[in-house]
Amino acid sequence: MKSIALVMFAMSWPVIACAQQRGAAVQLPEGHGKELVEANCARCHSLGLVANAGFSEKDWQDLFSSMVKLPSDQSSEIAAYLAKNFPEKPKPRAVVIPGSVNVSIKEWLVPTLGSRPHDPLATADGNIWWTGQFANVLGRLDPRTGAMKEFPAKTPQSGPHGLTEDKQGNIWYTGNSAGLIGKLDPKTGDITEYKMPNPAARDPHTPVFDQKGILWFTVQGGNMVGRLDPKNGDIKLATSPTPRSLPYGMVIDSKGAPWFVEFGVNKIARIDPTTMEIKEYTLPNSETRPRRVAITKDDVLWYSDYSRGYLGRFDPKTGAARDWPSPSGPQSRPYGIVALNGIIWYSESGVTPNTLVRFDPATEKFQTWVIPSGGGVVRNMMATRDGNLVLACSGRNRVALVTINRAVGSR
Protein backbone atom coordinates (compact mmCIF):
# COMPACT_ATOMS: atom_id res chain seq x y z
CA MET A 1 0.00 0.00 0.00
CA LYS A 2 1.25 3.43 -0.85
CA SER A 3 1.41 4.81 2.61
CA ILE A 4 1.56 8.61 2.59
CA ALA A 5 -0.92 9.51 -0.12
CA LEU A 6 -3.13 6.65 0.96
CA VAL A 7 -3.38 7.78 4.53
CA MET A 8 -4.02 11.36 3.51
CA PHE A 9 -6.96 10.02 1.53
CA ALA A 10 -8.07 7.80 4.40
CA MET A 11 -7.70 10.63 6.91
CA SER A 12 -10.66 12.40 5.39
CA TRP A 13 -13.00 9.44 5.70
CA PRO A 14 -16.24 9.40 7.40
CA VAL A 15 -17.63 10.76 10.56
CA ILE A 16 -15.67 13.82 11.61
CA ALA A 17 -14.90 15.48 8.32
CA CYS A 18 -17.55 14.05 6.03
CA ALA A 19 -19.48 17.25 5.45
CA GLN A 20 -16.32 19.33 5.19
CA GLN A 21 -14.90 17.12 2.45
CA ARG A 22 -17.72 17.63 0.00
CA GLY A 23 -16.44 20.92 -1.42
CA ALA A 24 -13.62 21.65 -3.86
CA ALA A 25 -15.34 20.11 -6.88
CA VAL A 26 -13.16 18.92 -9.76
CA GLN A 27 -14.01 17.74 -13.23
CA LEU A 28 -13.47 14.02 -13.52
CA PRO A 29 -12.50 12.60 -16.92
CA GLU A 30 -15.24 10.87 -18.85
CA GLY A 31 -15.16 7.10 -18.83
CA HIS A 32 -16.57 3.89 -17.47
CA GLY A 33 -16.68 4.24 -13.67
CA LYS A 34 -16.94 8.02 -13.43
CA GLU A 35 -20.51 7.98 -12.17
CA LEU A 36 -19.69 5.40 -9.51
CA VAL A 37 -16.80 7.53 -8.26
CA GLU A 38 -19.08 10.55 -8.03
CA ALA A 39 -21.79 8.55 -6.27
CA ASN A 40 -19.65 6.59 -3.82
CA CYS A 41 -16.52 8.64 -3.15
CA ALA A 42 -18.04 12.12 -3.12
CA ARG A 43 -20.34 11.24 -0.23
CA CYS A 44 -17.50 11.94 2.17
CA HIS A 45 -14.49 13.13 0.16
CA SER A 46 -13.86 16.06 -2.11
CA LEU A 47 -13.21 14.80 -5.62
CA GLY A 48 -10.06 16.88 -5.57
CA LEU A 49 -8.74 14.69 -2.77
CA VAL A 50 -9.65 11.57 -4.72
CA ALA A 51 -8.00 12.89 -7.87
CA ASN A 52 -4.76 13.74 -6.07
CA ALA A 53 -4.35 10.25 -4.62
CA GLY A 54 -2.61 8.10 -7.22
CA PHE A 55 -2.62 4.33 -6.72
CA SER A 56 -2.54 1.13 -8.69
CA GLU A 57 -5.80 -0.70 -9.32
CA LYS A 58 -5.03 -3.24 -6.60
CA ASP A 59 -4.19 -0.55 -4.08
CA TRP A 60 -7.47 1.25 -4.70
CA GLN A 61 -9.32 -1.98 -3.99
CA ASP A 62 -7.27 -2.56 -0.85
CA LEU A 63 -8.20 0.92 0.27
CA PHE A 64 -11.91 0.36 -0.33
CA SER A 65 -11.88 -2.85 1.68
CA SER A 66 -10.62 -1.07 4.80
CA MET A 67 -13.03 1.86 4.48
CA VAL A 68 -16.39 0.74 3.13
CA LYS A 69 -18.13 -2.35 1.80
CA LEU A 70 -18.68 -2.20 -1.95
CA PRO A 71 -19.99 -4.88 -4.31
CA SER A 72 -17.03 -6.49 -6.06
CA ASP A 73 -18.13 -5.32 -9.50
CA GLN A 74 -18.41 -1.70 -8.33
CA SER A 75 -15.08 -1.87 -6.52
CA SER A 76 -13.37 -3.21 -9.64
CA GLU A 77 -14.97 -0.62 -11.89
CA ILE A 78 -14.06 2.29 -9.62
CA ALA A 79 -10.51 1.03 -9.10
CA ALA A 80 -9.95 0.57 -12.83
CA TYR A 81 -11.27 4.05 -13.59
CA LEU A 82 -9.14 5.75 -10.93
CA ALA A 83 -5.99 3.78 -11.73
CA LYS A 84 -6.34 4.73 -15.40
CA ASN A 85 -6.99 8.41 -14.86
CA PHE A 86 -4.98 9.00 -11.69
CA PRO A 87 -2.06 6.56 -11.94
CA GLU A 88 0.34 5.61 -9.22
CA LYS A 89 2.85 8.32 -8.31
CA PRO A 90 6.51 7.74 -7.44
CA LYS A 91 7.04 7.42 -3.70
CA PRO A 92 10.07 6.56 -1.54
CA ARG A 93 10.60 2.84 -1.19
CA ALA A 94 11.27 1.11 2.11
CA VAL A 95 14.87 0.14 2.80
CA VAL A 96 15.11 -3.25 4.48
CA ILE A 97 18.20 -3.85 6.62
CA PRO A 98 18.68 -7.44 7.81
CA GLY A 99 20.01 -8.32 11.24
CA SER A 100 20.14 -10.84 14.04
CA VAL A 101 16.71 -10.13 15.57
CA ASN A 102 13.58 -11.81 14.25
CA VAL A 103 10.09 -10.43 14.61
CA SER A 104 6.64 -11.61 13.61
CA ILE A 105 3.90 -9.08 12.90
CA LYS A 106 0.25 -10.07 13.20
CA GLU A 107 -2.45 -7.60 12.17
CA TRP A 108 -6.19 -7.48 12.80
CA LEU A 109 -8.73 -5.49 10.77
CA VAL A 110 -10.86 -3.58 13.27
CA PRO A 111 -14.66 -4.02 13.14
CA THR A 112 -15.73 -0.57 11.95
CA LEU A 113 -14.44 0.16 8.47
CA GLY A 114 -12.89 3.58 7.96
CA SER A 115 -12.43 4.16 11.68
CA ARG A 116 -8.74 5.09 11.36
CA PRO A 117 -7.09 3.62 14.48
CA HIS A 118 -4.87 6.40 15.76
CA ASP A 119 -3.15 5.21 18.92
CA PRO A 120 -2.67 1.71 20.33
CA LEU A 121 -2.51 0.73 23.99
CA ALA A 122 -1.16 -2.46 25.53
CA THR A 123 -2.97 -2.94 28.83
CA ALA A 124 -1.86 -4.86 31.91
CA ASP A 125 -4.33 -7.69 31.23
CA GLY A 126 -2.73 -8.45 27.86
CA ASN A 127 -5.35 -6.79 25.68
CA ILE A 128 -4.72 -4.30 22.89
CA TRP A 129 -6.83 -1.15 22.72
CA TRP A 130 -7.11 1.44 19.99
CA THR A 131 -8.82 4.76 19.35
CA GLY A 132 -11.15 4.64 16.35
CA GLN A 133 -10.82 8.32 15.63
CA PHE A 134 -13.25 8.61 12.73
CA ALA A 135 -15.73 6.07 14.09
CA ASN A 136 -15.83 7.77 17.52
CA VAL A 137 -15.09 4.53 19.35
CA LEU A 138 -12.55 2.87 21.60
CA GLY A 139 -11.74 -0.67 20.59
CA ARG A 140 -10.43 -3.67 22.51
CA LEU A 141 -8.75 -6.76 21.08
CA ASP A 142 -7.82 -9.94 22.89
CA PRO A 143 -4.83 -11.09 20.81
CA ARG A 144 -5.08 -14.58 22.29
CA THR A 145 -8.54 -15.21 20.85
CA GLY A 146 -8.99 -12.47 18.26
CA ALA A 147 -12.17 -11.29 20.01
CA MET A 148 -12.86 -7.58 19.54
CA LYS A 149 -15.30 -5.15 21.09
CA GLU A 150 -15.91 -1.47 20.40
CA PHE A 151 -17.13 1.07 22.96
CA PRO A 152 -18.85 4.20 21.58
CA ALA A 153 -17.56 7.51 22.91
CA LYS A 154 -20.03 9.61 24.85
CA THR A 155 -19.82 12.84 22.84
CA PRO A 156 -20.56 12.51 19.11
CA GLN A 157 -17.65 13.19 16.78
CA SER A 158 -15.24 13.64 19.67
CA GLY A 159 -12.33 12.17 17.70
CA PRO A 160 -10.74 9.73 20.19
CA HIS A 161 -6.99 10.15 19.75
CA GLY A 162 -4.45 9.30 22.48
CA LEU A 163 -4.79 6.41 24.95
CA THR A 164 -3.44 5.43 28.34
CA GLU A 165 -4.43 3.19 31.28
CA ASP A 166 -4.61 3.95 34.99
CA LYS A 167 -3.73 1.57 37.81
CA GLN A 168 -7.38 0.58 38.23
CA GLY A 169 -7.63 -0.57 34.61
CA ASN A 170 -9.66 2.39 33.38
CA ILE A 171 -8.93 3.55 29.85
CA TRP A 172 -8.29 7.27 29.39
CA TYR A 173 -8.39 8.98 26.01
CA THR A 174 -8.20 12.43 24.50
CA GLY A 175 -11.23 13.70 22.60
CA ASN A 176 -9.17 15.55 20.04
CA SER A 177 -12.13 17.07 18.19
CA ALA A 178 -14.22 18.00 21.22
CA GLY A 179 -11.82 19.58 23.72
CA LEU A 180 -12.17 16.84 26.32
CA ILE A 181 -10.55 13.91 28.07
CA GLY A 182 -12.56 10.77 28.65
CA LYS A 183 -12.33 7.89 31.11
CA LEU A 184 -13.84 4.56 30.12
CA ASP A 185 -14.64 1.85 32.65
CA PRO A 186 -14.20 -1.27 30.50
CA LYS A 187 -16.25 -3.37 32.93
CA THR A 188 -19.39 -1.28 32.51
CA GLY A 189 -18.77 0.77 29.37
CA ASP A 190 -19.48 3.94 31.36
CA ILE A 191 -17.59 7.04 30.26
CA THR A 192 -16.78 10.10 32.35
CA GLU A 193 -15.80 13.21 30.42
CA TYR A 194 -13.65 16.13 31.53
CA LYS A 195 -14.04 19.23 29.40
CA MET A 196 -11.14 21.61 28.93
CA PRO A 197 -11.63 24.73 31.11
CA ASN A 198 -10.33 26.96 28.32
CA PRO A 199 -12.00 26.76 24.87
CA ALA A 200 -8.61 27.49 23.30
CA ALA A 201 -7.49 24.05 24.49
CA ARG A 202 -9.55 22.61 21.68
CA ASP A 203 -7.56 19.50 20.78
CA PRO A 204 -6.07 17.43 23.63
CA HIS A 205 -3.53 15.12 22.06
CA THR A 206 -1.19 12.75 23.93
CA PRO A 207 -2.05 11.61 27.51
CA VAL A 208 0.35 9.99 29.98
CA PHE A 209 0.20 9.25 33.72
CA ASP A 210 3.01 10.18 36.09
CA GLN A 211 4.09 8.12 39.08
CA LYS A 212 1.61 9.90 41.38
CA GLY A 213 -1.40 9.18 39.19
CA ILE A 214 -1.69 12.65 37.65
CA LEU A 215 -2.64 12.64 33.98
CA TRP A 216 -0.53 14.94 31.82
CA PHE A 217 -1.36 15.75 28.23
CA THR A 218 -0.42 17.89 25.25
CA VAL A 219 -2.79 20.19 23.36
CA GLN A 220 -1.40 20.41 19.85
CA GLY A 221 -3.28 23.17 18.02
CA GLY A 222 -4.11 24.97 21.26
CA ASN A 223 -0.35 25.19 21.94
CA MET A 224 -0.68 24.06 25.54
CA VAL A 225 0.09 21.30 27.96
CA GLY A 226 -2.12 20.27 30.84
CA ARG A 227 -2.59 18.16 33.94
CA LEU A 228 -5.72 16.45 35.21
CA ASP A 229 -6.13 15.16 38.75
CA PRO A 230 -8.40 12.08 38.54
CA LYS A 231 -9.31 12.43 42.22
CA ASN A 232 -11.27 15.64 41.71
CA GLY A 233 -11.27 16.28 37.96
CA ASP A 234 -9.29 19.49 38.35
CA ILE A 235 -7.53 20.54 35.13
CA LYS A 236 -4.69 23.05 34.89
CA LEU A 237 -3.27 24.32 31.60
CA ALA A 238 -0.03 26.03 30.64
CA THR A 239 0.75 27.70 27.32
CA SER A 240 3.92 26.80 25.46
CA PRO A 241 6.41 29.70 25.47
CA THR A 242 6.86 29.42 21.69
CA PRO A 243 3.82 30.38 19.59
CA ARG A 244 2.48 27.68 17.26
CA SER A 245 4.95 25.15 18.64
CA LEU A 246 2.42 22.29 18.37
CA PRO A 247 3.05 20.25 21.55
CA TYR A 248 2.86 16.62 20.45
CA GLY A 249 4.40 13.49 22.00
CA MET A 250 4.98 13.32 25.75
CA VAL A 251 6.79 11.09 28.28
CA ILE A 252 7.47 11.19 32.05
CA ASP A 253 11.01 10.93 33.41
CA SER A 254 12.09 8.96 36.48
CA LYS A 255 11.61 12.00 38.73
CA GLY A 256 8.03 12.57 37.61
CA ALA A 257 8.67 15.48 35.25
CA PRO A 258 6.81 15.50 31.93
CA TRP A 259 8.77 16.12 28.73
CA PHE A 260 7.22 16.87 25.38
CA VAL A 261 8.32 17.55 21.83
CA GLU A 262 7.21 20.57 19.83
CA PHE A 263 6.30 19.45 16.33
CA GLY A 264 5.96 23.00 14.98
CA VAL A 265 9.53 23.99 15.86
CA ASN A 266 12.88 22.36 16.66
CA LYS A 267 12.40 22.15 20.41
CA ILE A 268 11.98 19.75 23.32
CA ALA A 269 10.47 21.00 26.58
CA ARG A 270 10.21 20.05 30.25
CA ILE A 271 7.32 20.88 32.56
CA ASP A 272 7.96 21.52 36.23
CA PRO A 273 5.34 19.21 37.79
CA THR A 274 4.81 21.56 40.75
CA THR A 275 4.72 25.00 39.14
CA MET A 276 3.93 23.93 35.55
CA GLU A 277 6.69 26.23 34.35
CA ILE A 278 7.92 25.15 30.92
CA LYS A 279 11.60 25.13 29.96
CA GLU A 280 12.44 24.68 26.29
CA TYR A 281 15.58 23.21 24.74
CA THR A 282 16.40 24.08 21.14
CA LEU A 283 17.68 21.25 18.97
CA PRO A 284 20.71 22.03 16.76
CA ASN A 285 19.15 21.76 13.31
CA SER A 286 16.58 24.45 12.56
CA GLU A 287 14.76 22.07 10.19
CA THR A 288 14.20 19.42 12.87
CA ARG A 289 10.55 18.73 13.69
CA PRO A 290 10.28 16.19 16.53
CA ARG A 291 6.90 14.47 16.45
CA ARG A 292 6.96 11.61 18.95
CA VAL A 293 9.29 10.94 21.87
CA ALA A 294 10.48 7.94 23.89
CA ILE A 295 12.54 7.75 27.07
CA THR A 296 15.07 5.20 28.31
CA LYS A 297 15.75 4.26 31.94
CA ASP A 298 18.62 6.76 32.12
CA ASP A 299 16.15 9.57 31.27
CA VAL A 300 17.63 10.11 27.83
CA LEU A 301 15.03 11.24 25.29
CA TRP A 302 14.75 9.79 21.79
CA TYR A 303 12.62 11.50 19.18
CA SER A 304 11.38 10.91 15.67
CA ASP A 305 12.48 13.81 13.47
CA TYR A 306 9.59 13.64 11.04
CA SER A 307 10.61 16.42 8.67
CA ARG A 308 14.26 15.46 8.13
CA GLY A 309 14.03 11.67 8.28
CA TYR A 310 16.25 11.26 11.33
CA LEU A 311 16.26 9.50 14.70
CA GLY A 312 17.31 11.95 17.41
CA ARG A 313 18.76 11.67 20.91
CA PHE A 314 18.71 14.36 23.59
CA ASP A 315 20.40 14.05 26.98
CA PRO A 316 18.75 16.41 29.51
CA LYS A 317 21.71 16.08 31.88
CA THR A 318 24.19 17.58 29.43
CA GLY A 319 21.97 19.26 26.86
CA ALA A 320 23.75 17.30 24.14
CA ALA A 321 21.80 16.29 21.05
CA ARG A 322 22.74 13.85 18.32
CA ASP A 323 20.92 12.26 15.42
CA TRP A 324 21.18 9.47 12.86
CA PRO A 325 19.72 9.32 9.33
CA SER A 326 16.79 6.92 9.21
CA PRO A 327 17.45 3.94 6.91
CA SER A 328 14.92 4.88 4.22
CA GLY A 329 16.19 8.41 3.82
CA PRO A 330 15.09 12.03 4.21
CA GLN A 331 11.49 11.36 3.14
CA SER A 332 11.04 8.37 5.47
CA ARG A 333 9.05 10.43 8.00
CA PRO A 334 9.83 8.69 11.30
CA TYR A 335 6.74 8.75 13.50
CA GLY A 336 5.63 6.38 16.29
CA ILE A 337 8.51 5.56 18.65
CA VAL A 338 9.13 3.60 21.85
CA ALA A 339 12.08 2.48 23.98
CA LEU A 340 12.13 -1.17 25.03
CA ASN A 341 14.93 -2.66 27.13
CA GLY A 342 17.35 0.00 25.95
CA ILE A 343 16.52 -0.51 22.26
CA ILE A 344 14.74 2.16 20.22
CA TRP A 345 11.90 1.08 17.95
CA TYR A 346 10.04 3.38 15.58
CA SER A 347 8.11 3.50 12.34
CA GLU A 348 8.95 5.05 9.00
CA SER A 349 5.60 6.38 7.82
CA GLY A 350 6.65 8.02 4.57
CA VAL A 351 7.83 4.97 2.66
CA THR A 352 6.11 2.20 0.74
CA PRO A 353 5.41 0.03 2.63
CA ASN A 354 5.82 1.50 6.11
CA THR A 355 8.66 -0.04 8.07
CA LEU A 356 9.35 -1.03 11.64
CA VAL A 357 12.85 0.13 12.61
CA ARG A 358 15.08 -1.16 15.40
CA PHE A 359 18.06 0.88 16.57
CA ASP A 360 20.62 -0.35 19.10
CA PRO A 361 22.27 2.66 20.79
CA ALA A 362 25.21 0.52 21.93
CA THR A 363 26.21 -0.53 18.41
CA GLU A 364 24.47 2.27 16.48
CA LYS A 365 23.13 -0.34 14.09
CA PHE A 366 19.72 -0.37 12.43
CA GLN A 367 17.51 -3.28 11.45
CA THR A 368 14.21 -2.89 9.59
CA TRP A 369 11.12 -4.87 8.62
CA VAL A 370 8.21 -4.05 6.34
CA ILE A 371 4.73 -3.95 7.84
CA PRO A 372 2.63 -6.61 6.06
CA SER A 373 -0.43 -4.47 5.36
CA GLY A 374 1.69 -1.51 4.33
CA GLY A 375 1.02 0.32 7.59
CA GLY A 376 -0.88 3.27 6.15
CA VAL A 377 1.04 5.48 8.62
CA VAL A 378 1.88 4.02 12.02
CA ARG A 379 1.23 7.05 14.20
CA ASN A 380 2.10 5.50 17.52
CA MET A 381 3.35 2.33 19.13
CA MET A 382 3.74 0.96 22.63
CA ALA A 383 5.64 -1.78 24.43
CA THR A 384 3.75 -4.64 26.06
CA ARG A 385 4.51 -5.91 29.57
CA ASP A 386 6.13 -9.03 28.12
CA GLY A 387 8.54 -7.18 25.85
CA ASN A 388 6.72 -6.96 22.54
CA LEU A 389 5.12 -4.07 20.63
CA VAL A 390 1.66 -2.97 19.57
CA LEU A 391 1.00 -0.69 16.58
CA ALA A 392 -1.93 1.19 15.10
CA CYS A 393 -1.98 1.16 11.29
CA SER A 394 -4.26 4.11 10.61
CA GLY A 395 -4.73 4.05 6.85
CA ARG A 396 -5.09 0.27 6.80
CA ASN A 397 -7.70 0.23 9.58
CA ARG A 398 -5.69 -2.30 11.57
CA VAL A 399 -3.93 -2.88 14.85
CA ALA A 400 -0.87 -5.07 15.11
CA LEU A 401 1.15 -7.11 17.59
CA VAL A 402 4.89 -7.39 17.00
CA THR A 403 6.40 -10.42 18.69
CA ILE A 404 10.15 -10.02 19.11
CA ASN A 405 12.17 -13.22 18.89
CA ARG A 406 15.71 -12.40 19.88
CA ALA A 407 18.45 -14.41 18.24
CA VAL A 408 21.17 -15.97 20.39
CA GLY A 409 23.88 -13.41 21.07
CA SER A 410 21.77 -10.42 20.09
CA ARG A 411 21.25 -7.51 22.43
What name fits each language-model region?
Residues 18-36:
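Electrostatic cytochrome c docking/interface patches
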Residues 106-136:
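Beta-strand-rich domains and repeat architectures in extracellular enzymes and scaffolds
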Residues 129-134, 171-177, 215-221, 258-264, ...:
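Conserved beta-strand positions in repeat-built beta-propeller and related beta-rich domains
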Residues 142-146, 185-189, 229-233, 272-276, ...:
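Short loop/turn segments that connect beta-strands within beta-propeller blades
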